[in-house]
């Protein structure tokens, strides 16, 4: 049985609205994940908070407080998305590294494994629980903790390029690249802390574009033209 950690950006959930939620987009994601779960794959999910908050762009708010707001944004995202998942027939749980009253459960590896054993999709919200760590780092941390086989990194672009394809029409896309090359070339697939954690813990990633039809299922099966990041 395969276990994956899927990272979704908050912006992707907003669709063309660019903020908040686009229910049609989230429902498309949910139906794809249900295909994976029905086929026996164990799925953990981390969601960014960029559809609500970009703390690093604020010049007036203390960084620690800004990051805490970002953590809460990811909790809102995970609660919302988990309910959409339930509406299409999946069992879900939302785990956080800090207490949120009755809204979530406190994260532990044992608790996550128990939920996976019951075919539940497990959402890891709240980042690492500490400021100065991104949701990229939280993604790798949780993937390592739950012993995932790989990370599926769903992005707005369809893979890893040697430069920004939005500004450079001649940007070269990689079919496969090592995490060491990503670090050496400063390609910013994920941030440096997350990259080093991947390398040290031998956690592979597959980077792909979320917008392609059935992209998550195709990414798991190696049927999409993304970028494999090896370790």
What residues fall within each predicted segment?
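C-terminal catalytic "cap/lid" subdomain
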Residues: 1-231
